[in-house]
Amino acid sequence: LKCHQLVPPFWKTCPEGKNLCYKMYMVSSSTVPVKRGCIDVCPKNSALVKYVCCNTDKCN
């Protein structure tokens, strides 16, 4: 699995066990991702932060 890093088109190959790509947004500015990468479990959204997770190559 390969996930984008903070600035596409750059990406990295995910380590073993981290099988999801994710994007993290601040709820206040939901158009600009704050963080991207590989993760093992999709975090829950909170009042301030929203996560978008997916399990295909470079989908974040």
UniProtKB/Swiss-Prot annotation:
It is found in: Secreted; Target cell membrane. One of its GO terms (biological process) is killing of cells of another organism. GO terms for molecular function: toxin activity. It comes from the Eukaryota. Keywords: Cardiotoxin, Cytolysis, Disulfide bond, Membrane, Secreted, Target cell membrane, Target membrane, Toxin. Expressed by the venom gland. Pfam families: Toxin_cobra-type. One of its GO terms (cellular component) is membrane. Disulfide bonds join 3-21, 14-38, 42-53, 54-59. Is classified as a S-type cytotoxin, since a serine residue stands at position 27 (Ser-29 in standard classification). Belongs to the three-finger toxin family. Short-chain subfamily. Type IA cytotoxin sub-subfamily. Monomer in solution; Homodimer and oligomer in the presence of negatively charged lipids forming a pore with a size ranging between 20 and 30 Angstroms. Shows cytolytic activity on many different cells by forming pore in lipid membranes. In vivo, increases heart rate or kills the animal by cardiac arrest. In addition, it binds to heparin with high affinity, interacts with Kv channel-interacting protein 1 (KCNIP1) in a calcium-independent manner, and binds to integrin alpha-V/beta-3 (ITGAV/ITGB3) with moderate affinity. This is Cytotoxin 5. It comes from Naja haje haje (Egyptian cobra).
